[in-house]
Amino acid sequence: MGDVLEQFFILTGLLVCLACLAKCVRFSRCVLLNYWKVLPKSFLRSMGQWAVITGAGDGIGKAYSFELAKRGLNVVLISRTLEKLEAIATEIERTTGRSVKIIQADFTKDDIYEHIKEKLAGLEIGILVNNVGMLPNLLPSHFLNAPDEIQSLIHCNITSVVKMTQLILKHMESRQKGLILNISSGIALFPWPLYSMYSASKAFVCAFSKALQEEYKAKEVIIQVLTPYAVSTAMTKYLNTNVITKTADEFVKESLNYVTIGGETCGCLAHEILAGFLSLIPAWAFYSGAFQRLLLTHYVAYLKLNTKVR
């Protein structure tokens, strides 16, 4: 019995060491890619002629649209506000010389995908950025006290990722080439009290993306999920930027350095460090009543001080 226990503890120790080593390797690769930018400039362009970006009217989606156009791709912008799309398209064409198509669609609805499919027909799509999403409550809130937007959130945060991937992945598979970036969130990495619906919806994006990567990596299609923490956008009420909170432009430029790093990344070095720190917090402490009270008092005060929330 003693020998069995000894072998068990040795094996457990080895597994823990391997897990720590894997995290160190991932972190080291992030540092290397961030500071030395070893991704060839032609890599993204080699995926195909067009990039499709959902939620392109603001924030991260808008930043991806500009950055991918700057890197040589034509872009398809999809969002619900036509005026924003037209203004962004004009600016991209003027500053980059790339071709731009716009598709007006409201991702909180589920009857939009035939229209999108028709508009995308015939395009050689090399990159899909599933960015569109909604956060019903920026301020932490108990589930029953949060805005009743459950169906809209499911359509926007979950259905959009599945349906857009279904539309475009089949063509990438046949071409044996493509890149799909699914924008999740750092709070998807473990359940977050007081952000229950948003956290759960983004956890779906993580699980779906990782499973697809395993299914299609032999087809030379890269499917990566990004799990950023704070990015200053309209959805986060333009949270004041700092060493952790990035502008959308900063986040996007850095995240594109990591597209070959693996199936999951936080998208920027600062957020990788934050994720590592949060993973050290014991579950009993994270899910304690004291932590929830901390969110409801100090974190709310921080948000009100550093955003346009009042």
UniProtKB/Swiss-Prot annotation:
Its main location: endoplasmic reticulum. GO terms for molecular function: estradiol 17-beta-dehydrogenase [NAD(P)+] activity; testosterone 17-beta-dehydrogenase (NADP+) activity; testosterone dehydrogenase [NAD(P)+] activity. Coiled coil: none annotated. Testis. The keyword Ion transport does not apply. Its EC number is 1.1.1.62, 1.1.1.64. Changing residue 80 to Q: In MPH; Gaza; almost complete loss of testosterone 17-beta-dehydrogenase (NADP(+)) activity. Substrate binds at residue 185. The keyword Heme does not apply. Pathway: Hormone biosynthesis; testosterone biosynthesis; Steroid metabolism. It is found in: Endoplasmic reticulum. NADP(+) binds at residues 48-77. It is linked to Male pseudohermaphrodism with gynecomastia: An autosomal recessive disorder that manifests, in males, as undermasculinization characterized by hypoplastic-to-normal internal genitalia (epididymis, vas deferens, seminal vesicles, and ejaculatory ducts) but female external genitalia and the absence of a prostate. This phenotype is caused by inadequate testicular synthesis of testosterone, which, in turn, results in insufficient formation of dihydrotestosterone in the anlage of the external genitalia and prostate during fetal development. Belongs to the short-chain dehydrogenases/reductases (SDR) family. 17-beta-HSD 3 subfamily. Catalyzes the conversion of 17-oxosteroids to 17beta-hydroxysteroids. Favors the reduction of androstenedione to testosterone. Testosterone is the key androgen driving male development and function. Uses NADPH while the two other EDH17B enzymes use NADH. Androgens such as epiandrosterone, dehydroepiandrosterone, androsterone and androstanedione are accepted as substrates and reduced at C-17. Can reduce 11-ketoandrostenedione as well as 11beta-hydroxyandrostenedione at C-17 to the respective testosterone forms. This is 17-beta-hydroxysteroid dehydrogenase type 3. It comes from Homo sapiens (Human). The gene is HSD17B3.
